[in-house]
């Protein structure tokens, strides 16, 4: 076997569809595009979700809810990441300096994931019930 003798397996590649080449091909005259309408024209077609003028499903369904913009500037911090912060005080600035959260974050919440084995003081950062218990069990405290 040589590189110049390699070829695809028989039946692996199908021949290109040749449209508009006689009625015997099954794709003659209109070339599989049907008769008249936007889909038959060159460059034609309808956008995704268009239902021929009928009120689209997306608009027929009721509107509900909204996306809170606060979620985009709130970081979720694991307890194991809090342990990486140097110093005894954990606040928004120390979390940013340690590289735990990005500089665009305005709020943070510490969640119980992992463990902490030293006492830290959490200041100005919200904490879940489980994380609060773990921090206090390690000798730390939470200041609102």
Swiss-Prot record:
<feature type="compositionally biased region" description="Gly residues">
    <location>
        <begin position="21"/>
        <end position="50"/>
    </location>
</feature>
<keyword id="KW-0694">RNA-binding</keyword>
<dbReference type="InterPro" id="IPR001196">
    <property type="entry name" value="Ribosomal_uL15_CS"/>
</dbReference>
<protein>
    <recommendedName>
        <fullName>Large ribosomal subunit protein uL15</fullName>
    </recommendedName>
</protein>
<comment type="function">
    <text>Binds to the 23S rRNA.</text>
</comment>
<dbReference type="InterPro" id="IPR021131">
    <property type="entry name" value="Ribosomal_uL15/eL18"/>
</dbReference>
<dbReference type="InterPro" id="IPR030878">
    <property type="entry name" value="Ribosomal_uL15"/>
</dbReference>
<dbReference type="Pfam" id="PF00828">
    <property type="entry name" value="Ribosomal_L27A"/>
</dbReference>
<dbReference type="GO" id="GO:0006412">
    <property type="term" value="P:translation"/>
</dbReference>
<keyword id="KW-0689">Ribosomal protein</keyword>
<keyword id="KW-0699">rRNA-binding</keyword>
<dbReference type="InterPro" id="IPR036227">
    <property type="entry name" value="Ribosomal_uL15/eL18_sf"/>
</dbReference>
<dbReference type="GO" id="GO:0022625">
    <property type="term" value="C:cytosolic large ribosomal subunit"/>
</dbReference>
<dbReference type="GO" id="GO:0003735">
    <property type="term" value="F:structural constituent of ribosome"/>
</dbReference>
<keyword id="KW-0687">Ribonucleoprotein</keyword>
<dbReference type="InterPro" id="IPR005749">
    <property type="entry name" value="Ribosomal_uL15_bac-type"/>
</dbReference>
<feature type="region of interest" description="Disordered">
    <location>
        <begin position="1"/>
        <end position="50"/>
    </location>
</feature>
<dbReference type="GO" id="GO:0019843">
    <property type="term" value="F:rRNA binding"/>
</dbReference>
<comment type="subunit">
    <text>Part of the 50S ribosomal subunit.</text>
</comment>
<comment type="similarity">
    <text>Belongs to the universal ribosomal protein uL15 family.</text>
</comment>
């Amino acid at each position: 076997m040589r590189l110049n003798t390699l070829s695809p397996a028989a039946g692996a590649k199908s021949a290109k569809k040749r449209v508009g080449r006689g009625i015997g091909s099954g794709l003659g005259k209109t070339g599989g595009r049907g008769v008249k309408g936007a889909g038959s024209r060159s460059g034609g077609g309808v956008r995704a979700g268009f239902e021929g003028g009928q009120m689209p499903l997306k608009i027929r369904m009721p509107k509900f809810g909204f996306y809170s913009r606060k979620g985009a500037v709130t970081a979720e911090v694991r307890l194991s990441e809090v342990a990486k912060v140097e110093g005894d005080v954990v606040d928004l600035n120390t979390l940013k300096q340690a590289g735990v959260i990005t500089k665009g974050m305005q709020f943070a919440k510490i969640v119980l994931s992992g463990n902490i084995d030293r006492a830290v003081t959490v200041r100005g950062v919200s904490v879940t019930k489980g994380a609060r218990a773990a921090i206090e069990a390690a000798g730390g405290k939470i200041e609102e």
